[in-house]
Regions:
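Bacterial N-terminal signal peptides that target proteins for export
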Residues: 1-11
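Serine-dependent protease modules
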Residues: 24-212
C-alpha cells in the first residue's frame, strides 16, 4: 500500500492559492471559501496515447507478463491506441490560462476542460515540466474566474487548508485538512519542494488547488 504521504500529500498540494484566512482557534467553516473559489476550478479531460507498458498490461494476462516480461509480443492494432484520463485544473488569469499537473496531461493527443457551468472547451498545452509536475494550459475566451497564487513562505505547518477538485466532469469535491509539512522532496529528486497535507484527495483531483 502506498504511503498516505505519497498518495494524498503530493498530487494537489503543488499549488497553494491565497484566499480568505481562517481562525485556527475555532472550528473551521470552509463553506464560504468553497463558494468563492470553486467556479475557477475545472475538470480536465485528456485523450492519451497508450505507452507500450500500458498496452502490455491491457492486452496480455498478468501471469504471462510475470513469466515472459518484455518478450511478450503484443498483437498489432489498426490505428493509434488511446485512452481517456481525467484530472483537475484552475484558472490563473481571466484570459484563459490554467494550471494543472504534468502527469495529468502527459502524452495527451487532445485536451479539453469542463467548466463549472458544464461548458466544454478545447485546451492547448502552453508548457509543462515533469520534474516539478506542473503544466500550463490555455483556452480561448475572456472573463474567466481567476485565482491568485499564494506565497508558500507564509504558509505554516498545522495551518488549516482546503483541497478542491473537479473530478470526472462532476461537481467539485472539497476536502479539508492541515499542512503536515513543508519543503518535502520526492525520493530521488533534488530542489523540488512539495507541501504535504493530510486532506483526503479523491480520484480525478490531480491538478486541483490547495487553499489556505
Amino acid at each position: 500500500m502506498k504511503s498516505r504521504y505519497l498518495q494524498q500529500g503530493m498530487y494537489a498540494a503543488v499549488f497553494t492559492v491565497a484566499a480568505v484566512q481562517v481562525n485556527a482557534a475555532s472550528p473551521v467553516d470552509f463553506s464560504n471559501l468553497v463558494e468563492q473559489v470553486s467556479p475557477a476550478v475545472v475538470s480536465v479531460n485528456v485523450v492519451k496515447k497508450m505507452t507500450q507498458e500500458e498496452l502490455l498490461q491491457q492486452q496480455v494476462p498478468e501471469i504471462l507478463r510475470r513469466f515472459f516480461g518484455n518478450q511478450v509480443i503484443i498483437p498489432q492494432q489498426q490505428g493509434p491506441q488511446e485512452k481517456t484520463a481525467y484530472g483537475s485544473a484552475f484558472f490563473i488569469s481571466k484570459d484563459g490560462y490554467l494550471v494543472t499537473n504534468h502527469h495529468v496531461i502527459e502524452n495527451a493527443s487532445r485536451i479539453s476542460i469542463t467548466l463549472n457551468d458544464r461548458r466544454e472547451l478545447d485546451a492547448t498545452l502552453v508548457g509543462s515540466d515533469e520534474r516539478t509536475d506542473v503544466a500550463v494550459l490555455k483556452v480561448n475566451g475572456a472573463n474567466f474566474p481567476e485565482l491568485k497564487i499564494g506565497n508558500v513562505n507564509q504558509l505554516k505547518v498545522g495551518e488549516p487548508v482546503l483541497a478542491i477538485g473537479s473530478p470526472f466532469g462532476f461537481d467539485y469535491s472539497a476536502s479539508a485538512g492541515i499542512v503536515s509539512a513543508k519543503s518535502r522532496n520526492m525520493s530521488g529528486e533534488t530542489s523540488v519542494p512539495f507541501i504535504q497535507t493530510d486532506a483526503a484527495l479523491n480520484p480525478g483531483n490531480s491538478g486541483g488547488p490547495l487553499f489556505n
